[in-house]
Amino acid sequence: MNPVTNPFAPGAGTPPPELAGRDDLRETVRVALERVRRGLPTKSVLMVGLRGVGKTVLLDRMRDDAEAAGIHTLRIEAPEGRSLPALIAPQLRSALLRLSRNLKAKALAERALRGLAGFAKALKLKYADIEVGFDFDPEPGLADNGDLESDLQALLEATGAAAQQADTALVLFIDELQYVEEEELAALITALHRAAQRRLPVVLVGAGLPQLRGRMGRAKSYAERLFDFPTIGPLSVDATKRAIELPAANEHVEVTAAALDRIVAETQGYPYFVQEWGKHAWDTADASPITDADVELASTAAVAALDESFFRVRFDRLTPVEKRYLRAMAELGPGPHRSGDIAEALDRRVTSLGPTRNNLIEKGMIWSPNHGDTAFTVPLFDAFMRRIMPGDDWSA
């Protein structure tokens, strides 16, 4: 069929043609944001899930929903090696400049901009990557102590007061939160807690890998009372089929029931994989309908594409020792696995592998669902490791 009209869109953070199976969570967040705008008690929302489940796409769609409702937003991705103050400062400046155009909020927004100037100047020594334009001179004593926890609290209070005056809210949409240092997470939690205590319309909607829940708890013990942690998992069977059927139908293409069943089985409902199989099934089929035979042929191309992009980009970041650790996990199956079993597969002591395991957790490759357990953060990564490192040389 015509590849130009292929509706499927595999890619990191690429919006799918049909965002199936996520309506309930979108509605939950919509209600939360409307409540915070009205000054009602509301928990921030932190979505947790494996790679490839569509967290980034969902976060962006929720942001679109919020902005369509007249709510002010920040959109931040927290990459490794960047500080939270450096990520927040320029985005917050843009939001405050927008708020300053509201006549009711102008004075308070400008005060918050003075606070931002003091915040950036005071923290520049500790966080050298802070870069933000100054629109006003700092106000002495406002968010300028040089202590991130107290200064971020003061800054978000000032910003929340401006948003409240404008009858709106400020929502921080932050992706990859698991990469934020725990000290910086603690400061963010404290600031959000204070805003909630004062009924100021400032809230966080974030996303991260499953270890985020534990990191938030370690940063501040009361974090679990401030946040909801919905788990974003694979799509249901029905949602997976809708994610394929509806985009195809919009292009006047049918998909047989057997083809849909095979896609469900091959992808296990992971949205990234659903898009990959949809794309290759479309490109393989000569005409409508897409059949089971088309999907069977497409599976080889889909796996090869995943190996070269989705999986390989993560594999190439690993050291040889880390690759062997993950290959040992893969030998044991999808997981989770006990640390002792992984060590036994490598003929090593558990304690000697501790640094390797910690490095893999920091890189976002594995996580610990329970004490002593280890699991992949990337779906189907065990099968990839067996393909990329066949045989048993890894165990030597």
Spans of model-derived segments:
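Conserved Walker B catalytic segment
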Residues: E139-P210, G217-R218
